[in-house]
Every structure is written in structure tokens, then in C-alpha cells.
Amino acid sequence: CTALTDLSCFGNQLTSLDVSNNTALNILECSSNRLTSLDVSNNTALKNLWCYENKLTSLNGSSNTALTELDCSDNKLTSLDVSNNSALTKLYCSYNQLTSLDISNNTALFDLSCHNNQLTSLDLSNNKALTDLSCSDNQLTSLDLSNNTALKNLWCYENQLTSLDLSNNIAL
């Protein structure tokens, strides 16, 4: 069905999902399954992708330029490229195995949850719209929030931070 715009198939035992012909898909919720791979390269209209609680080892969203919300938490991702997703406002990628996360092109991002990974650094200098940040349980040694003046909620516990300057974050 090429006219399909919303697909919700969460909470099953799916090991594969073929949405390659569903080019009109706006919303895909395939969370809580057993997916090891997910090809959304033909789904260029995709705005919301919820694929958390699977077994994904990789996720390529480079062709999903309309994507505003991505939840790929609780998978086995070692890398995540969101550089082409400039419309992204919400990114949830917690409980993976990410060692780095480049969100410099995601200037519309206001909600970022990247806790419980293996991040050693996190550059938020371009993310001025950020209001919510959860980066706990990583290996961060520093966290520069001087450009994130809109920040209202911050969770950064269980890292290796030695100092934290919140003087510009008056909304906290």
C-alpha cells in the first residue's frame, strides 16, 4: 500500500520489516520488536520514527530529511548519523553503545536524550534551541552549556565532570 501514511506495529516479535514501497509514510512506530535492521531510505516523507527497544546495530536516516522526531533508544547502535536531519526537534538515543554523537547540524533540536551510552564528549554549541538535555551515565569529562541559554531541564549525573558552569543558563 503506497498510500499508507501511519504504521504502528510496536510490541510484536518482528524480526524484519519491509517498508520500502511505503513512500508516503509519515509516522513509523515499530518499537518493542526484535528488529536487527531497518531500511527507511525510501521513506523520504517520514517525520516521526520510533524504533526503540529493538536490536538495531545500525540506522541510516540520511534520506529522511523531513524527520522531526527520532527515538532509537534501547538498541545496539554504535554510531548514529543525524547530520542530514536538520528538521529534527526531538532525538532520543539513550541506552545504546554510542561513543560519539554529532548534532552540530540539528539546530532545531530542543529535546535531546542521549544518556546511558559511552559518549566522551558532546558538542552542543550549535543547539541553541535546546530546552531539555539528558546526558547522564556517559563518560563526559566536560560539558559546555554556555550557548544553551534556553535550557530548562538538565540531567548530567554519573559522568566524569570536574566542573560545570551554568552561569548563562538562567532558565534552569
What spans do the regions from the language model cover?
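Generic alpha-helical secondary structure signal
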Residues: T5, L56, N96-T99, L161
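Low-complexity/repetitive intrinsically disordered segments
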Residues: C1-T15, N153-L172
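Conserved hydrophobic beta-strand positions in leucine-rich repeat
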Residues: L7-C9, N26-C30, K47-C51, T68-C72, ...
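Leucine-rich repeat
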Residues: C1-A3, N22-L25, S41-L46, S62-L67, ...
